[in-house]
Amino acid sequence: MSDNAQLTGLCDRFRGFYPVVIDVETAGFNAKTDALLEIAAITLKMDEQGWLMPDTTLHFHVEPFVGANLQPEALAFNGIDPNDPDRGAVSEYEALHEIFKVVRKGIKASGCNRAIMVAHNANFDHSFMMAAAERASLKRNPFHPFATFDTAALAGLALGQTVLSKACQTAGMDFDSTQAHSALYDTERTAVLFCEIVNRWKRLGGWPLSAAEEV
């Protein structure tokens, strides 16, 4: 059997990338002008047999940056009151500094080289996180500047569904629509969905690659 067929480590599975599941809730669609209000992150790990699973969860309510737009339609959609003192919101710097610190530790521990965002319709979440990191002057951003794993695309391929709730249900997972549009809940569901898609491909024999497929 080839050496490649024995690879079960996280660093081997994604070409040295360390996948981190992210979801954000915002006050609009423009990452440069609209507020980031909530962010959750879940790191992933692999067991000794190469099965992917969620690992560490981080979750923060975020204070709107100075001068941020707060679109009423977006707030009505996600139900967030940015002025609610019970949110326990922190600055963009505090939230991302803690997430990046945990992610960098995970990269080192797993032998990976760089983090890659996993998200549902990932361009949206990626743009908001990157804009917030720039505003916060966080220089050591561990995430790839543009590459992502988009579970909307992956679920469309693997399950024939692109909506998060429908993809989860098709995969045999629970999805509580009353908890949707919470960054924490959506991140948890996205993490389990991504793991299921990756593990399903393994169960079907798609990974590890056969000797004939090795480059």
UniProtKB/Swiss-Prot annotation:
Its EC number is 3.1.13.-. Disruption phenotype: Required for optimal growth. Significantly slowed cell growth, increased expression of sodB reporter construct. Changing F29A: Abolishes enzyme activity. InterPro entries: Exonuclease_RNaseT/DNA_pol3, RNase_T, RNaseH-like_sf, RNaseH_sf. Changing H181A: Nearly abolishes enzyme activity. Its cofactor is Mg(2+). Residues 20-194 form the Exonuclease domain. The record marks F29, E73, F77, F124, F146 as: Important for substrate binding and specificity. Binds two Mg(2+) per subunit. The active form of the enzyme binds two Mg(2+) ions in its active site. The first Mg(2+) forms only one salt bridge with the protein. Pfam families: RNase_T (PF00929). GO terms for biological process: cellular response to UV; DNA damage response; DNA replication proofreading; regulatory ncRNA 3'-end processing; rRNA 3'-end processing; tRNA 3'-end processing. Mg(2+) 1 binds at D23. Keywords: Exonuclease, Hydrolase, Magnesium, Metal-binding, Nuclease, tRNA processing. GO terms for cellular component: cytosol. The active site is at H181 (proton donor/acceptor). GO terms for molecular function: 3'-5' exonuclease activity; 3'-5'-RNA exonuclease activity; identical protein binding; magnesium ion binding; nucleic acid binding; protein homodimerization activity; single-stranded DNA 3'-5' DNA exonuclease activity. Mg(2+) 2 binds at D23, E25, H181, D186. The keyword Hydrolase applies. Gene3D superfamilies: Ribonuclease H-like superfamily/Ribonuclease H. Disulfide bonds: none annotated. Belongs to the RNase T family. Member of the DEDD group of RNAses that are characterized by the presence of four acidic residues in the active site. These residues are conserved even when the proteins have highly divergent sequences. PANTHER family: DNA POLYMERASE III SUBUNIT EPSILON (PTHR30231), RIBONUCLEASE T (PTHR30231:SF2). Trims short 3' overhangs of a variety of RNA species, leaving a one or two nucleotide 3' overhang. Responsible for the end-turnover of tRNA: specifically removes the terminal AMP residue from uncharged tRNA (tRNA-C-C-A). Also appears to be involved in tRNA biosynthesis, especially in strains lacking other exoribonucleases. This is Ribonuclease T. It comes from Escherichia coli (strain K12). The gene is rnt.
